[in-house]
Each structure stands twice: as C-alpha cells, then as structure tokens.
Amino acid sequence: MSKIFKNRLEGLRALNRGVRALAKAVTSTLGPQGSHVVIKKDHSSPYVTKQGASIAKEIILPDAFENTGLKLIKEAALQMEAQVGDGSTTAIVLTDALFASGLKGVAVGLDPLEIKQGIQLAGAMLDEELAKLVVKISESEDIFHIATSSANHDAAIGKILADAIAQIGIEGVLSIKEGRGTETTLQATRHVGLNSGYLSSYFVTHPETMEVIYEDASILLCNQALSCLNQSFIHFLEQTFQTNRKPLIIIAEDFDPELLSILIVNKLKGNLPVCAIKAPGYGQQCKETLEDIAILTGATLVGDLLGISLSESSLDVLGRVEKIIVKRNTTIFSGGKGNQESLEQRIDYLRQAIVQSSSEMDTQDLEKRLARFVGGVAQIYLGSATENEYKERKIRLESALKAVKAAFKEGCLPGGGVALARAASIIKIPNELPIGVMFGCKCMLQSAEEPLRVLATNCGKDPEYVVDTVLKHADPYFGYNCINDSFENLITSGVFDPFSVTKCALKYSISISCLLLTSSFFIVDSSEKMQNPPLF
C-alpha cells in the first residue's frame, strides 16, 4: 500500500485544520447558553446532543492529514469522558487554542522542543494555582449544582442524582434503567444486599408480600455445596436446632434438592425457622461475596476447601443480623454484628483495590462490594418520550455521576472557565527563559483564557469585556454566571467545576498539543480519500 508524506510545516497546518474543524463543531455547545448539535446516523433516527465527546465520535474529515489531527484530539475528548465524565468540550477548546498559538511559533522558526518546554512549565504552574482555588463540597445543594452543570444543565437529572446520593452515599452503587413513560423515578436502599433470594417459596413468612422476614437471625455461610449426604452439616443442623432457637439463614454455593426438602419440612412443621439462599456468582466472585457477608455479620466462612469443616465447628461460626428480608431475587440485611476493626480493614482494602484497578468491569464489581459496607444501592428509572431521548439523557446522567464523584474526591473550582483564566493571570513568566520557552509559556497562559472567552461569546457577550471584568475583581471566586447573566461569587451561586475535570482537560490539551508541535514528518495511507484545501 502506498503512502503519502508531508513535511513539518505543511503537515502541522493540515493537522491544525483538523483540530480546528472539531473545535468549530463543539465550541458553540459550551455552557448553558450553548447550542445543540443534531446527529443523524445510518438506519437510525436523528438525535440532539451538547456532549463534546458524542459529537467528536461522529466527525470524519475527507482529507487524511486533517483527519489525523481530528483523531488525536478526539482521543483526548473520549479519554475525558471515560475518566471524569465531563470537560470534553473544554479539552477540545484548550487544545485548539494551544496548538494554533504554538504553531505560530514553529512557523517563524522557534524551536518546537523549547515551545513544548514552555507549555509544560506554564501548565505545571497553572496546576499549582488551581489547587489554591479548590473548595470542598458536602451539601446536597452542591451535588445538585455540579450534576446539573455536568448534565448540560438538565435540572431534572441534577435533582434525581442529588436525591440518590443523599440516600446511598457517594460510594453507593447507582444503576440506570429505562423508565415507563416520561417520568423519572428513584428506588434506593442503604441496607446491605445480595442479588439472590430464597430457593423456595415455602420459606416465605409473609405471604401477602412473598417475603421472608426475620429479626435477630443467625447466619451460616458455607463456601461449598450442601447435601443431605453431608453428615457434618446434618449434625450441625441438629446442634443448632437443640441449642439455638433463633431463625437460621443458610447461604451456600448450592443446595441438594433432597436437603432443601428437609429444610422446608422443618420450617413448615415449626421445628426451625430457616431459609436457604444460594450465594450469587461463581468461583472466586462467590467466595468474595461470602467473605464480605462474613465480615458484616460476624460469621466465620466454613467449607472443606477452606480447612474449616462443619464437623469441627461450634455455633460460634454463626453470624448475626438485627433483621433480614429475603425476596425471590434479593436479600437485605440490617444491623450486622461484625467486628468494627475488621469492617474498617475491609473498607480500606476495597477502596485501595478500586484505585489500583485497571479494568472497568473489576472496578464496577469492587464498587458494588464497597457499597455493602459504606453505601447503598439505587436504581434510577429514566423517563423519556423516545428511545433517542433516553440514550441522550442516559449519557448525561452517567457524565454527571462521574463528575460528582470527581468533585467529592478532589474538590471543586469556580466554574464558567473562571478558574483557568484567574490562575493564568496570577502567573509571572521568568524573564531569563530562552525565547522559545517563554513563547510556550505565553501560549499556555493565553490559551487558558479561551474557555471563558467561548462561554462569553455563546452568551452574546463581548469576551474581552467579560475577561477584563472578572480578572480585575479581587475575589478569587468572582466570575460571570452564564445562567443568570450576572457577575457574582460563583461558589456562593453554585457554579462549580470539579477540580479533576479542569485538571484533566489541561493535562490532555497539553499532551496532544505538545505531541503535534514536536512532530516533524507525517505519513498516511494513500488509500484514504484526499483533498487539497489551500494552506493558510
């Protein structure tokens, strides 16, 4: 397959046109007064969005070199969406401004490596100044403002997410499902749960609700399948029946049908209030679930493979809960009697494992396990009039959730592009720097004002006037509120940006811009359709 080549300046200009094309498409969407973009795919209905990452996914340019520039900045936008859920448009705006200004230096003969050094130097100083502006959030109203902003100013999504987090905590597990009709509803519980229920309806104690409900119940956890041939289990059951009249909940890998019948008969005769539950999952996942429940209830996980046989166990292996509610497919524990030190150790372990996890699936499993200890579980049934509206609102809600979690983790900055502009205005560039490094610093600091300028433009304001008015004010949190068209303290009025979102947008824009500016030769496949637009 033949290749096509371009030299440094010609190639950089072509890549810059690709970056600029994507920036033009998403710039008008930034902020509460930003416009929507209509996207129509083959064999599907058109849908409307303001998500920068969603727009970036759909744009392809006919020129192979321009498309290369677009693909690189698109990757930054998609990384932003995956990592922190918000800020993809800001990252694109920053990259466009930074690359375009840096390219001017390359065009007049400045050393690209010095320009890169200057950009990175100013970027590090911006990070330091931004950290000084961080404020912590805690109130439900703060969550509402952040979620609403990250959901493209959808107040309904902001409210439902704030309500969910108020009920299950920031470390709870939230799932999104399609609702019935246009109404969005929330179901949440803070109790510990299992995605598994009773194995037979004969265990039910409350027929009107088809639930098994016991108070002050004992918990037996077995990391093995149980059968009536297992004499050690039968002996343990008899011992429990004779000395412990509390309800017995047995959670095991599996149950032999004959053993299940024996348990049902004992329950129906009133000999022993009992319920059998099959542990969810298989293999290691099942074992980890049982270990979590053991720590929560104070039980000892028994099983031949663990070296802890029922034949050698006393009633001390039983855990306890204040109350348990078992349905056909779910189990809810309340008031587990686990050791507090063991609980804290397991919570620390799970939090550390989440930080170190590199797999999204593993991270989700770990978050669900952590929710058993410190949070709860919530389901949002998202209302919508059409399937496309549901998909778009689901993307907004997922983005808002990531942004809120990011805000809790690292705090917030005054929003509306103000934090970057104010941090840039504080930084003083050392005079003794080489000319290329100094130029790179200036490129970075000037580009940091671009998100604020774009927001002002989208609100119909003079960007120069807005920037000057904001930066002249002594209050570091003073800025322009696009929602009510006023200058005020943005923290007080609830205009936030998660610190990690701004930090990531800065990081990715610097990374992509420096990568492009220090490239000197460009190669693409000639099989890609080519056009020859005039160089600027």
From Swiss-Prot:
ATP binds at T29, L30, G31, P32, K50, G416, D497. GO terms for biological process: protein refolding. Its EC number is 5.6.1.7. It holds the Pfam family Cpn60_TCP1. Coiled coil: none annotated. Disulfide bonds: none annotated. Its main location: cytoplasm. It is found in: Cytoplasm. Keywords: ATP-binding, Chaperone, Cytoplasm, Isomerase, Nucleotide-binding. InterPro entries: Cpn60/GroEL, Cpn60/GroEL/TCP-1, GroEL-like_apical_dom_sf, GROEL-like_equatorial_sf, TCP-1-like_intermed_sf. GO terms for cellular component: cytoplasm. GO terms for molecular function: ATP binding; ATP-dependent protein folding chaperone; isomerase activity. It catalyses: ATP + H2O + a folded polypeptide = ADP + phosphate + an unfolded polypeptide. It is an enzyme of class 5 (isomerase). Together with its co-chaperonin GroES, plays an essential role in assisting protein folding. The GroEL-GroES system forms a nano-cage that allows encapsulation of the non-native substrate proteins and provides a physical environment optimized to promote and accelerate protein folding. Forms a cylinder of 14 subunits composed of two heptameric rings stacked back-to-back. Interacts with the co-chaperonin GroES. Belongs to the chaperonin (HSP60) family. This is Chaperonin GroEL 2. The lineage of its organism: Bacteria, Pseudomonadati, Chlamydiota, Chlamydiia, Chlamydiales.
